Amino acid sequence: MGLESYHSDHDRYPYGTEAPFNNHGVAVANGEEYSSNVVYMALFGDHKNEGVPSRDTTIYNDELNPSTQPKSNPTVREVHVKSKDGRPVTLYILADPWGSPYRYRLGSEQSIPTRTDRARNLKMGNGLNPDYDFWSFGKDGDSDLKDPHAPENEDDIGNLPKF
């Protein structure tokens, strides 16, 4: 599995703001709409969101190559969004079979490695699981991120092992 291999090599799961990732702060591992971009960048090695792996990078999942995706039902979709400062940004996200973005969130036991003693091992993850949450809103495309037992979550597909 790509995320486990990434974790083995880096001693952490990807969180989206670390170098060399360049998504202009639009996508981080918080479960929001474009959060699967973090998984795409980490596993395919496309650190600049150009649709190709960065030079001299490890590709953990070559099935995420946008140029080889089936046109009828691609796993990787190109989306155009605005950065925090209003500039247009292209992102590649992972899409479920219904065309909606997968969601990715760091787990409750995950932390951001930092260089300062004051902020060392700052907890970032707020997932339901200790490592990470990776899920689809399901066929209805709706979910309640705050209440895992909400009725709209009944068709959600959680912690997918695919990536």
Describe the role of every protein-language-model region:
Residues M1-F163:
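N-terminal pilin/flagellin-like segments and related low-complexity appendage regions
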